[in-house]
């Protein structure tokens, strides 16, 4: 695990974006990551998006680490998993 990127267990469901949003601490600075609920269902099957996220947390956090290291944030500074 990359100690420079940490993921606190503070994921939430965002009704506006229909996504699970979760913070990442990058060298102590908070960044926001997200994955759409539809993407979670497509990848992992039926279920509530928050439950699917929690079940597959380690893989999704690893993917988020890759997106953060690649600097692939959107115009709002968020890192979205596709």
Label the model's feature ranges:
Residues 2-4, 46-82:
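Acidic, low-complexity intrinsically disordered segments
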Residues 1-23:
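Short, charged/polar N-terminal "headpieces" of proteins
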Residues 16-44:
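A short, structured beta-strand/loop element
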